[in-house]
Amino acid sequence: MVPEGEGSGTEPVSPFYIPATGTVSTQRPHVLKWDDSFAVLDPFGNIHRAATGEGVFFEDTRYLSRLVLRISGRPPLLLSSALDETNTFVSADLTNPDLIDGGRILLAKDTLHILAETRLGPDGFEQTFALTNFGPGDVDLPLDILFDADFADMFEVRGTVRRRRGSTGPTRRSRED
């Protein structure tokens, strides 16, 4: 909720208000393993493009090289994250950061709870999201899931350079939107 006197979209933010805009996690990455597949995720359940070794791999090839959740273009805040004892399921509790525009709070931190659950198993890799609104009214904002695939060999991900590699073509859609 917005602190008393702190704008809920109608009042300006106090000069003493410290907005919650990001989370720094000191947790180690989560590694999911199933048969010839494995996934390396950050504690949020994200996969970043940077040379972190994160991704979803099958038979030594990285298929998914990016999977990132954004709320109004911003990363969520991490509340907690846990890997189950089978190393096939990770659960991350997330919330929204303060969304501020023009000195006014559009959505106060902790208004939304996001449960991000990620599974790796016989049916493949799956990530689901459940959102709960703890605010007094409806919330209308963009929720983006950014993803990419590079089909990199596991050794390339670790830093080995190939002499030749195929090129990435333009994105094609199977149907008109």
Label every model-predicted segment.
Residues 1-177:
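Terminal accessory carbohydrate-recognition/targeting modules of carbohydrate-active enzymes
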